[in-house]
Amino acid sequence: MMNVLIVHESMFGNTRQIASAIADGMRDATTQGGDVQVVHVDDAPTTIGDDVDLLLVGGPTHGFSMTRPQTRQDATSKGATAAREGVREWIAEVTPRHGLPVVTFDTRVHVKMLPGSAASAAAKALRHRGFDRAERGETFWVKDVQGPVVEGELERAREWGVALAARVSHGVS
């Protein structure tokens, strides 16, 4: 049995779509039962249950990293859904669980030579927080800050979900 929690931050809905596609892939690949939950960071638990086998954390890349209050405010002025907090703040509040596999992902605009990644920053912050098995996962591309998701990325996210499910079911996380 595999239980997965996917925590995401999504301002324009792009990262939510990616998180849902990853979850669909994991559900499609799981023959042993279990549960794959997708929750917005505003509703995410600050204690990860012992029944969770894999934690995925994803968010948009804003200002070369995870969002901050100012970048979220800027996005809201462009029509984004306002969030109480972002992945950065959630990581600062969540109780670490030693030994839990954690994989991060992000969405971002493909701009040549643009440094920084929310997935990299989140993995580093999670390790610093005490999640010793946190690793950077995938980046998924959006056409513009507001989206949409680049064609083919939802399918790639679903396929990545299938691959992650295989890793977990074989004990290689």
Predicted segment positions?
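Residues at the starts of beta-strands that form the adenosine-phosphate
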Residues: 2-3, 35, 101
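Helix-loop-strand module that forms the ligand-binding subsite of alpha/beta enzymes
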Residues: 39-129
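N-terminal beta1-alpha1 ligand-phosphate binding loop
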Residues: 2-30
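Short phosphate-binding/catalytic loops that engage adenosine nucleotides
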Residues: 31-34, 131-132
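A structural preference for short, hydrophobic beta-strand core positions in alpha/beta folds
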Residues: 35-40, 135-138
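Short histidine/acidic/glycine/proline-rich micro-motifs that form metal-
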Residues: 12-13, 108-113, 142-144
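Glycine-rich phosphate/pyrophosphate-binding loop and the adjoining helix
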Residues: 132-173
